[in-house]
Swiss-Prot record:
Gene3D superfamilies: alpha/beta hydrolase. This is Putative carbamate hydrolase RutD. Involved in pyrimidine catabolism. May facilitate the hydrolysis of carbamate, a reaction that can also occur spontaneously. GO terms for biological process: nitrogen utilization; uracil catabolic process. It comes from Caulobacter segnis (strain ATCC 21756 / DSM 7131 / JCM 7823 / NBRC 15250 / LMG 17158 / TK0059). The gene is rutD. Its EC number is 3.5.1.-. It catalyses: carbamate + 2 H(+) = NH4(+) + CO2. GO terms for molecular function: hydrolase activity, acting on carbon-nitrogen (but not peptide) bonds, in linear amides. Belongs to the AB hydrolase superfamily. Hydrolase RutD family.
Length: 267
């Protein structure tokens, strides 16, 4: 594994060298941590070099955002910076929620830098249910604090039966997540960027091969958002899983990984 930093963004390369090879770039969701992709790493690194990174403001990356409004376009621009640092002309991007939305922004703003795109539980326009969930998380963070926000987080991410079976694991991870939580203003700016994200009128401009992947029981992002993406993107496939929640890449990695590998290996 090779590590580096560009403009404050901490990244890792699993599989070196990358020159002249197809590369997979993984982009996490709201939390921003590259560690989110642990359940996918073995399946991917057996086949391709893989680049992971902590989003700006999170994890090991710089713990602040630039002055002024922050947007999903800014998240996409950070992908370009990581690719530039590695000398990559393009990459296949796999993004979860915020990371998938950033991949869509990359497709529009820098189409030549994107190979294939995988959008997991993403969306293309504001949605009332997503707004309600994020409003609740904002109130938790502002009115109760980081510990309450982190303690409630599994409710938004995972199915109830999985939470029950994995209670000990989740409690053990909680202190780690609290200790590494981004500054409050960073998290609020990231949430507001996602709430403002709206490329719905431009979906037909994205010619890339896209896999839209969604879980039917996602409590945070309605599956109808993914169905809309898959229907309106000109060159999209749709992967639906019946169970797993918003974080089904964690709760059912085997099902997700099978569809992911098949898509990336396909024509």
């Amino acid at each position: 594994m090779t590590t580096g930093t560009v403009d404050g963004i901490c990244y890792e390369v699993h599989g070196w060298p990358v020159a002249g090879r197809e590369v997979v770039l993984l982009s996490s969701g709201l939390g921003g941590s590259a560690a989110f992709w642990a359940p996918q790493m073995k399946a991917l690194t057996e086949r391709w070099p893989v680049v992971t990174y902590d989003h700006r403001g999170t994890g090991r990356s710089v713990r602040a955002l630039p002055p002024g409004p922050y947007s999903v376009d800014d998240m996409a621009q950070d992908m370009v910076k990581v690719m530039d640092a590695l000398g990559l002309t393009k990459a296949h991007v796999v993004g979860h929620a915020a990371g998938g939305n950033a991949g869509l922004a990359l497709a529009l703003n820098h189409p030549d830098r994107l190979g294939k795109l995988v959008v997991v539980n993403g969306w293309s326009r504001p949605d009332p249910h997503i707004q309600r969930c994020f409003d609740t998380r904002i109130h938790l963070l502002n009115d109760t604090g980081i510990k309450a926000y982190v303690h409630a987080q599994p409710i938004f991410l995972y199915p109830a039966d999985w939470i029950s079976r994995n209670h000990a694991r989740l409690m053990a991870e909680e202190a780690h997540h609290v200790a590494g939580f981004p500054p409050r203003e960073v998290m609020l700016a990231r949430i507001n960027a996602l709430l403002a994200f709206d490329i719905d009128a431009r979906l037909e401009e994205i010619p890339h091969r896209v896999l839209v992947s969604a879980s039917a029981d996602d409590m945070l992002v309605p599956m109808s958002c993914s169905q809309r993406l898959a229907a309106r993107l000109p060159n999209a496939d749709f992967q639906q899983v019946a169970w797993g929640g918003h974080g089904f890449t964690v709760t059912d990695p085997e099902t997700f990984n099978e569809g992911l590998i098949k898509f990336l290996e396909g024509a």
